Regions:
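A short, acidic/glycine-rich surface segment
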Residues: 16-20, 80, 123-124
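Alpha-helix N-capping/helix-start residues
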Residues: 54, 134, 147-148
Length: 166
């Protein structure tokens, strides 16, 4: 069955705390995802180049991305996708997809679906590259298979990924 992303997910954009406040950055408190972090990661993201402090979270109002949430870049490098291995935060070029529990979904299935989707359809050409906005992304449709089919798709694609990696 086909669904618009907004029907099955709560879409959450990240945020960048002020770079002018050095106490916000690289304290080791909380991992903060940027596009660069998604460039060379596998299915799960567990490490980030930068971290933010608790005061950065509180004072900037940035929202947490819970563990096992699919995240995807949607500005400049569209479609770089991963699943959070733990609670994290992200910048505004990363969208987190919180499952609304409308239909049975496995994060690994969504990961592969997003990874192989042609995101150029509906993207706008920006000065430095392509970009999607939240409204356009929310209207995009994806095919959701039954939970049994999702498990089979994940199994096959995991096997292929392992063969390619080795």
């Amino acid at each position: 069955m086909r669904y618009k992303l907004k029907e099955i997910f709560e879409l959450q954009m990240g945020k960048t705390p002020s770079r002018h406040n050095s106490s916000y950055w690289n304290t080791g408190d909380y991992k903060w995802i940027s596009i660069a972090d998604l460039s060379n990661v596998g299915k799960y993201i567990s490490e980030t180049k930068e971290t933010i402090s608790e005061s950065a979270v509180i004072e900037s109002g940035i929202k947490i991305i819970p563990a096992n949430t699919v995240v995807m870049s949607f500005k400049l490098s569209i479609g770089k996708t991963a699943i959070t291995a733990e609670d994290m935060y992200s910048n505004e070029a990363i969208m987190a997809f919180h499952d609304k529990k409308i239909v049975e979904l496995l994060p690994e299935y969504i990961y592969y679906l997003f990874k192989f989707k042609d995101w150029n359809v509906g993207s706008n050409k920006a000065v430095m590259g392509k970009t999607l906005n939240k409204a356009t992304l929310a209207e995009m449709e994806i095919e959701i298979h039954t939970i049994e089919e999702q498990k089979e798709i994940i199994k096959v694609l995991d096997q292929i990924s392992n063969i390619i990696a080795n």
